[in-house]
Amino acid sequence: IALDVFQKNPNHPCAAHYAIHAFDSPKLARLALLSAKRYAKIAPASHHAQHMSAHIFVQLGMWSEAVTSNINGWHTSVEWVKKQNLPLSERDYHSLHWLHYSYLQQGRLKKAESIFNIQQQDMRNGINSKSNFRAGKYYHRMLSASVIETEQWELIENFPPPEGWQPKIFSKAAYH
């Protein structure tokens, strides 16, 4: 249905959005590629719209496009938080997490590390698990991805859980 609506109206944000969700798997992603390429242009002020295309780009191994989508998603959320005078915890850490992963897939380890550093800095600046569960879960996902994707098992020793945080299940094994 979403693709039918999108084909009739390529400026329909919901049609593009739902097509991306519906075909977010390696075998089906190509069906939503046009939606993915268009969605960010339809809703330029939406950090979610800027990021969503990355779901299709990642499935298709389009890492440069995934990086661009997630950079745009992150920066759009940062600007929105500033403009609305919101706490840092409202920034789009999902885009940041996917940007980190995309850099790892490209072998751009220094860039991935710089993204992980943003996450760590924000956590030190007052984002805690009680005020924002989302931000915290991405810390552990990023750490786990860094260790697994680079096979640098010693990384875990350099990043004990931040004060007040409990490791998530997928990070606990690495700490032992």
Task: Give, region by region, the residue ranges found by the protein language model.
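TPR-repeat structural position
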Residues: 28-29, 63, 109, 153
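Residue at a conserved register position within TPR or TPR-like alpha-solenoid repeats
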Residues: 22-23, 57, 103, 147
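TPR repeat positional signature
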Residues: 16-19, 50-53, 91-92, 96, ...
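A conserved hydrophobic secondary-structure block that centers on an alpha-helix together
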Residues: 1-50
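Solenoid-like repeat scaffolds
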Residues: 6-8, 37-45, 75-86, 120-131, ...
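Residues that mark the junctions of alpha-helical repeat units in TPR/alpha-solenoid scaffolds
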Residues: 12, 46, 85-88, 92, ...
